[in-house]
Amino acid sequence: MSPIIDALVPMVVEQTSRGERSYDIYSRLLKERVIFLTGQVEDHMANLVVAQLLFLESENPDKDIFLYINSPGGSVTAGMSIYDTMQFIKPNVSTVCMGQACSMGAFLLAGGAPGKRYVLPNSRVMIHQPLGGFQGQASDIQIHAQEILTIKTKLNKLLAEHTGQPLEVIERDTDRDNFMSADQAVEYGLVDAVLTHRSA
């Protein structure tokens, strides 16, 4: 992080028997098993999220992890590293959309533990087909085009599994940018409920 960004991250000071201990707010929330996935999904961010998931599993493999998502999407391979880790680890990963979960963000939102995927009421969710661009020789472009189609098929099959929608519906609905409100995301099966208040 840049020094300017570091200065904007709040610090939390706790009193312990051994004196004061200060944490940045994200580290303090990590103690409560809360992980933030915000901004563009890319390799560096994915590595941090994966490391936090693995750390929390080692701390307690039987306690839920909460993944808060506010993302416009990003790299498919970076997103799949997070997704595969979510499925691999023992704790349930509860996903919560705040703001937006678009593209790979929506895919990760849907990949949370069944019954534990949530969206806040004024958030938006967007699904679409993977994007790609490549330059080079015609044969290389053809190889990359085929790879994008393979990835598209894989993502559609996984979305069908997580939403309960037929594959042909997913294929149709991801053909172009498809925005949904919180209630529409629940109806579609991307999430299980809209959260308006914390339960008592």
Swiss-Prot record:
The active site is at residues 103, 128. GO terms for molecular function: ATP-dependent peptidase activity; ATPase binding; serine-type endopeptidase activity. SUPFAM superfamilies: ClpP/crotonase (SSF52096). Gene3D superfamilies: 2-enoyl-CoA Hydratase, Chain A, domain 1. InterPro entries: ClpP, ClpP/crotonase-like_dom_sf, ClpP/TepA, ClpP_His_AS, ClpP_Ser_AS. GO terms for cellular component: cytoplasm; endopeptidase Clp complex. Coiled coil: none annotated. Its main location: cytoplasm. It is an enzyme of class 3 (hydrolase). It comes from the Bacteria. Its EC number is 3.4.21.92. It is found in: Cytoplasm. Keywords: Cytoplasm, Hydrolase, Protease, Serine protease. GO terms for biological process: protein quality control for misfolded or incompletely synthesized proteins. It catalyses: Hydrolysis of proteins to small peptides in the presence of ATP and magnesium. alpha-casein is the usual test substrate. In the absence of ATP, only oligopeptides shorter than five residues are hydrolyzed (such as succinyl-Leu-Tyr-|-NHMec, and Leu-Tyr-Leu-|-Tyr-Trp, in which cleavage of the -Tyr-|-Leu- and -Tyr-|-Trp bonds also occurs). Belongs to the peptidase S14 family. Cleaves peptides in various proteins in a process that requires ATP hydrolysis. Has a chymotrypsin-like activity. Plays a major role in the degradation of misfolded proteins. NCBIfam families: clpP, PRK00277.1, PRK12553.1. Fourteen ClpP subunits assemble into 2 heptameric rings which stack back to back to give a disk-like structure with a central cavity, resembling the structure of eukaryotic proteasomes. HAMAP family: ClpP. This is ATP-dependent Clp protease proteolytic subunit.
